[in-house]
Amino acid sequence: MIVDQNVAFAPAKINLYLHVTGRRSDGYHLLDSLAVFAEACDVLRYRDGDQAAGLGLQLEGPGAETLRAEPDNLVLRAGRALAALAGIKPRGTIMLDKRLPVASGIGGGSSDAAAALRLLSRVWGVSPAAEDLHRIATSLGADVPVCLEPGTYRMRGIGERLEALPAMPEIGLLLANPGVPVSTPEVFRNREHGFTPEATLASRWPDMAALLRDLQLSRNDLQPPAMRLCPAIGILLHALEGLPGARLTRMSGSGATCFTLFDHPDAARDAAQLLQAQSGMGGWCWGGGLYKTASALDKTTL
């Protein structure tokens, strides 16, 4: 059950591992990744309006100053594409509370676009076929399809080939960003030559120990080049590894956000408070659990 029909959450996407497995003739890299979603999220709210005014976007929150409500914003592009598919005129205003850091390796913009598709489908009363929605999502970006229905996924291809996996065991997640944006194209350009085979994964993970066994045999191929471009990532990873109860620490996506796994969400919250209290810790930090459903989020999120 949705808490509010006019509200949608855009949770952070975390790549627990990321292997670069090849490269297409058009230059796009092929990936193999295990993606989950955290309770940390942006929040989208819809206010109805006149069709003559079209669809508008208002930005607020900590990350708003780094974005612009211009026509090429992914949220507006998603709305226009959905309206075109449904044969209607886009209308209303989306208020985007930007809480996640921008250009940080956790799919914030992609998740915002996917949340906009879910939200506008609901408030405009349209029911696009799943394949049509997936096609729109893919046209917006390789990371948008996985964000349509947040869960646990194996991502392949350029990110558009998705395999839904069984739910994760309960784990804690600490996310931290040093406050330095990292360019994804630059990270790929600075990657060493060669490719990594796809990871071997179990069919399910009954507990944290089973999950860690698989993750310890994998890696993030983009972490070394990102660390060369942004030394603050290495400093942050070292700090995360030293936190009490830390089980696995790694960078997500192309950075600069890093994560640490804990046995329980409460342990991750405690560690986040400790990290924030440490001298010199700037940027952004969050601790909690995995995203389950919109209604499962604490109402204080709103």
From Swiss-Prot:
Gene3D superfamilies: 3.30.230.10, GHMP kinase, C-terminal domain. GO terms for biological process: isopentenyl diphosphate biosynthetic process, methylerythritol 4-phosphate pathway; terpenoid biosynthetic process. The keyword Membrane does not apply. This is 4-diphosphocytidyl-2-C-methyl-D-erythritol kinase. Belongs to the GHMP kinase family. IspE subfamily. Its EC number is 2.7.1.148. It holds the Pfam family GHMP_kinases_N. One of its GO terms (molecular function) is ATP binding. Catalyzes the phosphorylation of the position 2 hydroxy group of 4-diphosphocytidyl-2C-methyl-D-erythritol. InterPro entries: GHMP_kinase_C_dom (IPR013750), GHMP_kinase_C_sf (IPR036554), GHMP_kinase_N_dom (IPR006204), IspE (IPR004424), Ribosomal_Su5_D2-typ_SF (IPR020568), Ribsml_uS5_D2-typ_fold_subgr (IPR014721). ATP binds at residues 101-111.
